[in-house]
């Protein structure tokens, strides 16, 4: 049995990319592994946010987790902010990281450029040290595997580097070195309008993003209007047919069909027929998720389970934070 750790930010609404890149992985892994899955609300305050929206989004994300099939009794699912050891270890890790390596993080460069697009906005320090909190999220639990999308791979590699660095400095196996878990398909779903960029809740043009709580008729419209090409041939070729390849990835993830099977299925068929099948598969999934979501969001069941899991989690991580503090000469944590 492996220990697996991962989480998703509680900003805006989760997307089909979040589901296929992360949530579906969690569901597949939860039966045979020990899983710590958190709603990353502390990561959500690294950029400008509205407190009332954040509070609502936290519960929304938790309800979507449950609606998608994550078991709150089998897994330890919790709010990141409910376990203070995350931020405590994050500070310690920040003290063992370097300005240069944090400056090289691609996500920091991209997000800081967007934040300061007009040249007058200050860049939050939290955005710069985001990878340190992510490293703490992982190393705190001695994770064996961490399911991440391709865009988080660099942060994951940094977490490994810092763990190795601290183990070497203190001449002890303070942290387990985690491995990346990345599924072959679905780790990165692209935008429907611009398949050169990742499908994201923060993209300016929402026509390219499918949100899990979108109306199904809107979802179908987005898929039918998705960018393809003039070849009118369903073929997996990311370089020459990025739009079609992206739709094939989505269809593959939802039907468990390989790309060559999909190519054969739609041989001599036009893009309209192909898009209709993709839309059918996506809408079937979303109808089921949304029905269950309403039940969970409008009850107190999830909040009660999150509170119970946070207590369980704190008991586990306090042992780890004590070990870290003692190793650094900081004494025993009394929290």
Swiss-Prot record:
Gene3D superfamilies: HUPs, Tyrosyl-Transfer RNA Synthetase. Keywords: Aminoacyl-tRNA synthetase, ATP-binding, Cytoplasm, Ligase, Nucleotide-binding, Protein biosynthesis. A motif ('HIGH' region) lies at residues 10-18. A motif ('KMSKS' region) lies at residues 198-202. GO terms for molecular function: ATP binding; tryptophan-tRNA ligase activity. Disulfide bonds: none annotated. Its EC number is 6.1.1.2. L-tryptophan binds at residue 137. It catalyses: tRNA(Trp) + L-tryptophan + ATP = L-tryptophyl-tRNA(Trp) + AMP + diphosphate + H(+). It holds the Pfam family tRNA-synt_1b. GO terms for biological process: tryptophanyl-tRNA aminoacylation. ATP binds at residues 9-11, 17-18, 149-151, 189, 198-202. It comes from the Bacteria. It is found in: Cytoplasm. One of its GO terms (cellular component) is cytosol. The keyword Nucleotide-binding applies. Catalyzes the attachment of tryptophan to tRNA(Trp). Homodimer. This is Tryptophan--tRNA ligase. It comes from Malacoplasma penetrans (strain HF-2) (Mycoplasma penetrans). The gene is trpS.
């Amino acid at each position: 049995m492996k220990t697996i750790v991962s989480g998703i930010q509680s900003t805006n609404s989760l997307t089909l990319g979040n589901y296929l890149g992360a949530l579906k992985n969690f569901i597949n892994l939860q039966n045979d592994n020990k899983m710590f899955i958190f709603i990353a609300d502390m990561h959500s305050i690294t950029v400008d946010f509205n407190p009332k929206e954040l509070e609502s989004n936290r519960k929304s994300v938790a309800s979507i987790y449950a609606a998608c099939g994550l078991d709150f009794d089998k897994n330890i699912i919790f709010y990141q902010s409910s376990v203070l050891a995350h931020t405590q270890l994050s500070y310690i890790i920040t003290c063992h990281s370097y300005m240069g390596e944090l400056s090289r993080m691609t996500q920091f460069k991209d997000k800081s450029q967007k934040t300061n697009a007009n040249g007058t906005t200050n860049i939050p320090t939290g955005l710069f040290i985001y990878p340190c909190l992510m490293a703490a999220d992982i190393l705190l639990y001695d994770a064996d595997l961490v399911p991440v999308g391709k865009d988080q791979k660099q942060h994951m590699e940094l977490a490994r580097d810092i763990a190795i660095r601290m183990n070497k400095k203190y001449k002890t196996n303070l942290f387990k070195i985690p491995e990346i878990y990345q599924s072959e398909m679905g780790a990165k779903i692209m935008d429907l309008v611009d398949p050169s960029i990742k499908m994201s809740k923060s993209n300016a043009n929402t026509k390219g993003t499918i949100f899990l709580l979108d109306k199904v008729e809107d979802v179908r419209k987005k898929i039918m209007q998705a960018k393809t090409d003039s070849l009118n041939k369903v073929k997996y070729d990311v370089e020459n047919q990025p739009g079609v390849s992206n739709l094939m990835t989505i269809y593959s993830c939802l039907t468990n069909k390989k790309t060559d099977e999909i190519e054969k299925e739609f041989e001599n068929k036009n893009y309209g027929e192909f898009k209709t099948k993709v839309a059918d598969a996506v809408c079937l999934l979303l109808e089921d998720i949304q029905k269950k979501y309403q039940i969970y969001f409008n009850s107190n069941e999830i909040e009660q389970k999150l509170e119970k899991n946070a207590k369980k989690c704190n008991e586990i991580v306090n042992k780890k934070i004590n070990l870290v503090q003692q190793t650094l000469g900081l004494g025993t944590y009394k929290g």
